[in-house]
């Protein structure tokens, strides 16, 4: 089962709010997810991002691949750097 970390759209029309979820790559964008690991609100200024860093690192170490947008969010929060350090220290 290929697992991805991606955004699940919530909110109302023209007012998007996203959950950062772990889901099977074959499931629909807003379909069933395995676990929620954070939220992303692009509407407010500054952008609001909340991520459970421990869960994100755990899922990536198990082989979950983040989508391009989630990878950018993780990079801004410093999670990708921690993941690479953790991966290279083994």
Swiss-Prot record:
Gene Ontology BP terms: translation
Gene3D superfamilies to which the protein is assigned, alphabetical: 3.30.1320.10
The entry's keywords: Ribonucleoprotein, Ribosomal protein
Molecular function per GO: structural constituent of ribosome
InterPro entries: Ribosomal_bS16, Ribosomal_bS16_dom_sf
Annotated disulfide bonds: none
GO CC term, one of those recorded: cytoplasm
NCBIfam families tied to this protein: S16
Protein family membership: Belongs to the bacterial ribosomal protein bS16 family.
Protein name, UniProt field: Small ribosomal subunit protein bS16
Organism expressing this protein natively: Oceanobacillus iheyensis (strain DSM 14371 / CIP 107618 / JCM 11309 / KCTC 3954 / HTE831)
